[in-house]
Amino acid sequence: MITLTPGRLTLPQLRRIARENVQIALDPASFAAIDRGAQAVADIAAKGEPAYGINTGFGRLASTHIPHDQLELLQKNLVLSHAVGVGEPMARPVVRLLMALKLSSLGRGHSGIRRVVMDALVALFNADVLPLIPVKGSVGASGDLAPLAHMSAVLLGIGDVFIRGERASAAEGLRVAGLAPLTLEAKEGLALLNGTQASTALALDNLFAIEDLYRTALVSGALSVDAAAGSVKPFDARIHELRGHRGQIDAAAAYRSLLDGSAINVSHRDCDKVQDPYSLRCQPQVMGACLDQIRHAAGVLLIEANAVSDNPLIFPDTGEVLSGGNFHAEPVAFAADNLAIAAAEIGALAERRIALLIDATLSGLPPFLVKDGGVNSGFMIAHVTAAALASENKTLAHPASVDSLPTSANQEDHVSMATFAARKLADIAENVANILAIELLAAAQGVDLRAPHATSPALQHAMKTIRADVAHYDLDHYFAPDIAVVARRVRERAFATLSPLSFESEQ
């Protein structure tokens, strides 16, 4: 059980919500603030004075006053008219994160929503009744309206859900969770719809995947150093301290730890090779820059996870209703775009190391890492696959946040495109997982070919993990299953856990 304290969510909590089947509860300490906010809205609605989002239309229709006897219909119509998403359903971890983030935002007490609505979201979550939310349809301002409308429609008994992974009607989902359809009161529909929770959930889910891939890439990169008989001197701490970037310093320390005790390294310590290619030698510089970006993005997303991104905002102490723009997801878009660049670079650097390993001139290994070259093609086309994926990622890494299209009759004339920025991270991460799988296979092959000299104790664990599923490549065979099984192990964090470096979300 994870207790959600609104405004104080942590990255470890969010990773567990995404990756484990934990249940959640709202911190009782938040109840008073929630109740004050709801009462403030009820008081404003009772007075009848125009207040945006409470008794007016929305967006371009904000100047339209809504009579008191139509306020419940207004909220219902808002939810139904905004549920216009298209595409495949959001993944289960993303929906779980989205619901938890929405609860945290509402729980700060500035959205004016009743506790009964929030209790219903908690009940759905804990019963594993998750709204079916189409993944496309948000531009990241005014909030993630369409995705959150699909979540909210379920509270009304409308739409579809997944009950323990099986698709069903929202009405059936409510029954399983022990709930009846809700009637939303003044502002509650808007409070549910307005916010950055969809884009932030997508970005967080992919952040955790990219963190795992980063750790895996440290392992595969270190293994490639030994496979190519590379030097460990470029990882000397003194070099990196002189530059001063925290990520570079930490990455270099990870490579030193992973390669410590390598007999392969000792075997060529006195060779006449002066410098390794950049894909080996500059790993701390490149991976360090990636690490800094990943850490920065994690910090931005944690702030957003704890933010109140509703509009308008209720300030119960003064009774004020303030319209602003906290729904604009530009911080999320920038964080996701930075993650895309970092993840694409992780894959691009790994692809270069694969190219190095199969090149006999550079690596000193048999051409394409296989004996009897000519009859056998070895890793020749596996590298082509890695190159194709790395190239695809370069296009996917183009920033989404530099685009904007005006919406809502030009009332919402600049948007963030944060949801797309966050959504395409999944494609980038999947490509990187496959590139790293190919590198792990190629590096393991190279290390085998360095026998009788062995790699380091730390990297021998990686070798055992690979060889438990895939044998040494002696002769050409149907290669795709080898890549698939190692890629699956990459996704399962089998290699990430071998890295000495970890992230805040894993603490």
UniProtKB/Swiss-Prot annotation:
It is found in: Cytoplasm. It comes from the Bacteria. GO terms for molecular function: histidine ammonia-lyase activity. Keywords: Cytoplasm, Histidine metabolism, Lyase. One of its GO terms (biological process) is L-histidine catabolic process to glutamate and formate. There is a cross-link at A141-G143 (5-imidazolinone (Ala-Gly)). The modification 2,3-didehydroalanine (Ser) is found at S142. Its EC number is 4.3.1.3. Its main location: cytoplasm. This is Histidine ammonia-lyase. The lineage of its organism: Bacteria, Pseudomonadati, Pseudomonadota, Betaproteobacteria, Burkholderiales.
